[in-house]
Structures are given as structure tokens and as C-alpha cells.
């Protein structure tokens, strides 16, 4: 028995070819009339065959979805394409030639691909709208603390930040604040080792209470106190497994549902704070200069890539590439070769906020 599609094609042949063949001879003297009749019959057959084929609307919708996902991926990959302008400040002094003598500004490159993404430096109002009602957790070492400081500096005025800065930078301590105007809660968790971050994520899962945005990073303390790249790599893999268990895997990463053991809750946006460029000659202790070498830094970077914790290698965390930002800002953007001036972390925060806009399909 012929299927519906085959019957439709057979009917089309009969309806189109027979009348056109019969009419061809009689209308050959009037080609305009002949082709008008042929067009009319073809359109009529098209209308009758349409139900037997996939909806054109569905096809266009599918293609559009693929294009949107591809555009999002492209723009995410271009977020760190920034340029720096480092110039002598008006009060420049040759007697005190350090980073405070230089003004730093940055912006995204003007290439056509970057311009098409329409990245923007969010204002206080824009950032407040984006993070309204959110719970943000920033966890890690001193690099994470600078990220938390830069985010709060964007959301609050300088008067409020005076007291916050002192509390936030209390040595090796946690910090929590609620920005009442927008109902945003920020927790900074002192977690210098990757194992601390694993414990933190397991706590979220155990309590079934998850932040909207989770920003974390580690490596500097491990490099200084353990100086063992392979051990660092093992701890990263354990952290990756813990984070993956929290998140439903998106179709963009190749699967349609949650992984085994994941929980059916709103998944947080998760970021990884990369380690900065280390300028060995500027490090302020002998132990740091001896252990935190370029070779050791390279070994730690390779373990980070090998762990597949980052989105770019198939993992769940989107990288905030402090190494790239600090390298491009340069030696005039740091006093101690490890901690960089505020603009570097401000750039990282703006990159993070633009990633949130892209991933949540929002525009301001």
C-alpha cells in the first residue's frame, strides 16, 4: 500500500503533467497564457502537498535557533578581546615609579566580529537591573576577593565602599552583604584551595540551596604551599565532578537532559577566576620567587586544561581570564607581580556581566 507521501507525489504528477501536456499544444501560440496556467497549477499542487512535508515554519525556527546558539558561542569566545591604554598620570613622579603613577583604561577591540556582539560596559543602573534579586557567591583566594570588591564598587557609591573595603579585606575571612536597594546578596567565601571549593559546592547540593551566580578560583596558594601541579590537577577534577552534579547539562554541550545525580533546580551561572600573570622578579618574598616560577605556572595551567573544568574544554565553568587581562595591562598595572590594579578586576567583572547578558538572552 502506497503511503500518503507517495500518493501525494503521484497525484501531483497527474494534476500537473496531464493538464500541462494537454494545454501545451493549444496554448503554444500564447506563451504568456501557457506559463500563467502552469504557474497556477504548480501553486495549487504545492498547497495540496504542504501537509505532507515538515512545516516551513518549524524548519526556519530550527535554523534560527542554531544560528542564535552559534552567535552566542562566538560572542562568549570574544569577550576577552580587549585593549589597554596605560599612560602616565598627571602626578607622575620619577622618584616613585610604580603602578599608581599610571592611568589605566580598557575597551573591547573594534574588529567587526567583536562589534557585532555589542558588548557594553554596564553602568551602575544597568548592573543593578541585571543582578536585581540575585544571590551571588564569590569564593577563592585574594583574586576572588578583588573580583568581589570590583563588583560591589560598581553597584555602590564610594561612600558606602569605604567601610565595606575594610571589612572585605580582613585577613582570611568570609564576608556577606545585602544590597537592599536591589535585593542582591553577595557572599565572599575565603577558599584558597580547590578542596575548599569542592566542599562549598557539595554544601549547596546537600542543602538544596543554590546561588544564581557562582564565581570561584584557586591555584596561587596551592602553588606556593604545595608546589605540586599533578596534585592540583586531581583536586580540579574532583571539583569538576562536584559542579557537574549540580548542573543540568545544556543542549549546547551535547545532551538533552541532566546528568546522573543532578537536581531539578534552576542552575547557577558558574565562572572560574583564572590565575594572573606572575612577574617573578616582582614577587615580594623569596619563597614566592623560588616556587612560583614561569615553569611551575605553565604546569598548573596544563592541569587546568586537562581537568576539563572549563567551558572551552567541555566543562561547566566559563573562564574569567585574569592571565590575559593582566598580561595585556602589563608590568605597570601591578606592584607585587601577583595582585593587579583595580581596572584589571573591573574588566573581569564587566566581562562576567556581559556573559550573563548573553547566556540569559537579555539586552539592556
Predicted regions and their residues:
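A compositional signature for long Ser/Thr(±Pro)-rich, low-complexity
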Residues: 1-364
